[in-house]
Each structure stands twice: as C-alpha cells, then as structure tokens.
Amino acid sequence: MLYLIAEWLGFEGALNLIRYQTFRTGATLMTALVIGLIIGPRFINMLRVRQGKGQPIRDDGPQSHLAKRGTPTMGGLMIIVSLVLSLVLWMDLRSPFVWACLAVTVGFGLIGFLDDLDKVTKNSHRGVSAKVRLLMEFLVAGIASYIIVSQINTWLYVPFVSDRAIPLGPFYYVFAAVVIVGAGNAVNLTDGLDGLAIMPVIIAAGTFAIIAYLAGRVDYSEYLGIPHVPGAGELAIFCAAIMGAGLAFLWFNAPPAAVFMGDTGSLALGGALGAIAVASHHEIVLAIVGGLFVFEALSVIIQVFWFKRTGKRVFRMAPIHHHFEQLGWSESKVVIRFWIVSIVLALMGLATLKLR
C-alpha cells in the first residue's frame, strides 16, 4: 500500500526509499516483528480462555510432553495476522506472486485452523481426516500454481549443473502443487517440540529472501547462472514478513512454550515456503534448504511403510525428533541441534547459487 502511495506521489523526498526492495524488506521484517510482539499476549490470553484444555497431548508420546497439557494452540493465527498486515503495508500489491503466496498462506492457514479446531473441540489429536485435508490443500495449491506458472516458464532447473533444465510442460502445474502441499505437510510434521519448526522456517525464509532477490535481478542472475524471474524480488519482502512474524512467535514459543502454532501456523508457513520456491524457480533448492523438513517427513513415511509391511518399527518413534527424545536427548538438545542442521543446510542451499 505504501509503495503504491509513494509511486503516486512520485517517490518525492524520503518516499524515494520505498522504491528500493532492500529497504522495504527490512521495514517489513521489523513491522511484522513489532506487530507480533504487540498482539501476541492478547492472542494467547484469548486462545487460553476459549480453548480451556488447550492442545490435546498424546498419551503414547514422550512422557515429558504431558506437562504441556493446557497450552493453547492455533498460535499460527498471530503469525498470519502479523505477516499479512506487514505485507499489505510494504509490498507492491500488483505482483501476482504476492497474491499467489498470500492465497497459499491464508488458505493453508484456514485448513490448519479447521484441523486445530476439530482437535480442540473433540479433545483428540486426530483432527480432520487426511484425505479431506489433502483435497483442500491441493485445491488451494492448484489455484496458486496456476497464478504462478502463468508468470514463469515450465522448466525445472537443476542446481550445481550449468545450463541444465528439464522441460515439464503442462506437468509443471502438478509438480508445483505437489511442492507446495509437500512443503506444508513437511513443516507440519516437524512442529512437535517447542521452537523446533519455527526457527528452521525463519532460516529457510532468510535464505529464500536472498535467492528471490538475486533471481529478480537480471545482472545477478546472469552472473550466477540462475534462472531470472522478473518480479521475484518482491518475494524477498514476503520472506522478510515470515521472518519477522516468526521471530515474534518464537518469543512466546520458546521453551516452555506459552502457545503452540498448531496446524494453523505450520501448514501456512510450509505452504508459503513451497510457493516462494516455485515462484523463484528454486524448487530443488528448497529440498536442500528445508532438508530438515524433508528428513522429518521421510521418517514418518519410512516408519509407516515398514510397520505395515513387517509389523516392526525403524525408529523408536516418528517423526524423527521424537526418536531422539526416546534415545534420551532432552527436548532443548534436540531443538538446538536441529537448528544447527538447518543453518548448515541453508548454507549448502546458498552454495548452489555459485557452484556449477
């Protein structure tokens, strides 16, 4: 909104700063952070009053988690509100990428909200059926993919290799939707410990802020040999909003958590990262930067497949973070070590920009 107003006024005087994406990226991060810190306590109190028992805690999970009973969930609402308000304020709202990513964020957030609401209402950890949830997710992702792909080509670019791209044609629409849905659910599976999911999301968003900015610049993209995506620079501002809102949420989610983001937040943030990766044409890089989320999702897939096939478990408990808890690692040790892994993976992802 401010960008359009400043443009209408001719970017006169101090308004000229708003012309630059780098300035708006920093301003968006700070705005989302401040909004989140201001509304956080009110949101948490409201959720605590309305939910009563809070998020249901599984009896068959780690026994240390039983102490978390009564902690409110749906904290993802404050993330989404902080993110959306800061974006409306600072982004160029004419960008189709903005609306596609916003559609995924809000749409997936709504799906997660319905899932959380069902869990809280029924005091059960099951929520909405997986088939119904996936159907709704693919519907939202399909719409967003259509908007995004109308602005970019349908080639899949391979990192670490010069001038190597795979033409997917119409199948790219399906591929894009799978990336978005997969990212949303991978982050959702990672969100099982205080602070575990939100910091890797912040790290991934920071990494993609750099990638999106570079992809949006003709000079940098040509120098690095990465696909140039006109208008992708605005996605750096979207990433900054995720970072700011995420940091504000972490303030309240730090152990012991005062609130859980729930499926409302994890699906929204994961889906947003997937949409940003598709729009910036760095889908494979997302699998590297978000490798922790991939690892968590694979641990569940492997556990379920192997148990159905043999009746035995590969891990003591899935997702994998619970396996390490069962090995005797404290929750804080699991969380911090997984954060370290996320930082290393982010650096590896950035290395793909130059290593050919």
From Swiss-Prot:
CDD domains: GT_MraY. The keyword Cell cycle applies. It catalyses: UDP-N-acetyl-alpha-D-muramoyl-L-alanyl-gamma-D-glutamyl-meso-2,6-diaminopimeloyl-D-alanyl-D-alanine + di-trans,octa-cis-undecaprenyl phosphate = di-trans,octa-cis-undecaprenyl diphospho-N-acetyl-alpha-D-muramoyl-L-alanyl-D-glutamyl-meso-2,6-diaminopimeloyl-D-alanyl-D-alanine + UMP. One of its GO terms (molecular function) is metal ion binding. Its cofactor is Mg(2+). GO terms for cellular component: plasma membrane. Pathway: Cell wall biogenesis; peptidoglycan biosynthesis. Its EC number is 2.7.8.13. It is a multi-pass membrane protein. PROSITE patterns: MRAY_1 (PS01347), MRAY_2 (PS01348). The keyword Transmembrane helix applies. Its main location: membrane. It is found in: Cell inner membrane. The chain crosses the membrane at residues 27-47, 73-93, 97-117, 138-158, 165-185, 195-215, 232-252, 258-278, 284-304, 333-353. Keywords: Cell cycle, Cell division, Cell inner membrane, Cell membrane, Cell shape, Cell wall biogenesis/degradation, Magnesium, Membrane, Metal-binding, Peptidoglycan synthesis, Transferase, Transmembrane, Transmembrane helix. GO terms for biological process: cell division; cell wall organization; peptidoglycan biosynthetic process; regulation of cell shape. It comes from the Bacteria. Pfam families: Glycos_transf_4, MraY_sig1. InterPro entries: Glycosyl_transferase_4, PNAcMuramoyl-5peptid_Trfase, PNAcMuramoyl-5peptid_Trfase_CS. Catalyzes the initial step of the lipid cycle reactions in the biosynthesis of the cell wall peptidoglycan: transfers peptidoglycan precursor phospho-MurNAc-pentapeptide from UDP-MurNAc-pentapeptide onto the lipid carrier undecaprenyl phosphate, yielding undecaprenyl-pyrophosphoryl-MurNAc-pentapeptide, known as lipid I. Belongs to the glycosyltransferase 4 family. MraY subfamily. NCBIfam families: mraY. This is Phospho-N-acetylmuramoyl-pentapeptide-transferase. It comes from Erythrobacter litoralis (strain HTCC2594). The gene is mraY.
